[in-house]
Swiss-Prot record:
It catalyses: a primary alcohol + NADP(+) = an aldehyde + NADPH + H(+); S-nitroso-CoA + NADPH + H(+) = sulfinamide-CoA + NADP(+); S-nitrosoglutathione + NADPH + H(+) = S-(hydroxysulfenamide)glutathione + NADP(+). Pfam families: Aldo_ket_red (PF00248). GO terms for cellular component: apical plasma membrane; cytosol. This is Aldo-keto reductase family 1 member A1. It comes from Gallus gallus (Chicken).
Length: 327
């Protein structure tokens, strides 16, 4: 079944498929085949970012599969990318998007997100660091970056724009100056970080929420030895047995029923296909609440740095760091 049938509408009428292919941590050598396979089995939503350093390979897949006389029409595909932290200066925004478009071999994006609210030093080094290993920050106001992003919509380079990793206060701050409203907020979200308040905040303001790491990001580099493993959660495994589905499919179904878009990453064909097969069953209201009640406010994705031999949150020193607020 194609995920193309199962979507939510953005405030501007665009339709975003509820399941997309995530590409963070997908190796350049593998990502082209993963995207081609995903498109062949019915995916119509691909989530990308300049900072993942694999957009050119994704572009090769698009070139083979998408466009006039190809299997998929461009207008049937939803492509997201993200503006990186080193490109927040208003003058850098359009060139950054044009580079992404050239890499992806596309004329426009369906959605362009500001990847984080905080900026790094301008330049082409994705992770500019001081000699002691800490990040070199820039203090461009994200509202100025937003105003530059609005021009991309006027120019037809992006159909919609949005935010990633912003907290509720920062979202309202952007809304206070926006002439083009953010259409989407993309954040980490899964039963251990259910984000109920943030989702309600967004839905009230007309933003659709996309969940990254919806399966708890089992392949991260920095792992805490004591962290809970979402795919091993007994309640989830029990539901998987009941519906003859995998624990991953239960997690994705839970989000789809909440009208939350998910972008599970995989380069394995069997998993790519399985992640799409969540539209042939439903969880009961009781089961939905049970999965939601597993929340522990456990954030798996906090970028870390090693400073003086100790792991520390990479961006906590920036005034716009989003994770100090309750939500």
């Amino acid at each position: 079944m194609s995920a193309g049938c199962d979507f939510v509408a953005l405030y501007n009428g665009q339709k975003i498929p509820l399941i997309g292919l995530g590409t963070w941590k997908s190796e350049p050598g593998q990502v082209k085949e993963a995207v081609k396979y995903a498109l062949s089995v019915g995916y119509r939503h691909v989530d990308c970012a300049a900072a993942y350093s694999n957009e050119a390979e994704i572009g090769d897949a698009f070139q083979e599969c998408v466009g006039p006389n190809k299997v998929i029409k461009r207008e049937d595909l939803f492509v997201t990318s993200k503006l990186w932290n080193t490109k927040h200066h208003p003058e850098d925004v359009e060139p950054a998007l044009r580079k992404t478009l050239a890499d992806l071999k596309l004329d426009y994006l369906d959605l362009y997100l500001m990847h984080w609210p905080h900026a790094f030093e301008r330049g082409d080094n994705l992770f500019p660091k001081n000699p002691d290993g800490t990040m070199r920050y820039d203090y461009t106001d994200y509202k100025d970056t937003w105003k530059a992003m609005e021009k991309l919509v006027e120019k037809g380079l992006a159909k919609a724009i949005g935010l990633s990793n912003f907290n509720s206060r920062q979202i309202d701050d952007v809304l206070s100056v926006a002439t083009v409203k953010p259409a989407v907020l993309q954040v980490e979200c899964h039963p251990y970080l259910a984000q109920n308040e943030l989702i309600a905040h967004c839905q009230k303001r007309g933003l659709v929420v996309t969940a990254y790491s919806p399966l708890g990001s089992p392949d991260r580099m920095w792992k805490h030895p004591d962290e809970p493993v979402l795919l091993e959660e007994p309640g989830i495994k029990k539901l998987a047995e009941k519906y003859k589905k995998s624990p991953a499919q239960i997690l994705l179904r839970w989000q789809a029923q909440r009208k939350v878009v998910t972008i599970p990453k995989s380069v394995t064909p069997a998993r790519i296909l399985q992640n799409l097969q969540v539209f042939d069953f439903s969880l009961t209201e009781e089961e939905m609440s049970h999965v939601g009640s597993l929340n522990k406010n456990w954030r798996y994705i906090v970028p870390m740095l090693t400073v003086n031999g100790k792991p520390v949150p990479r961006d906590a020193g920036h005034p716009n760091y989003p994770f100090n607020d309750p939500y």
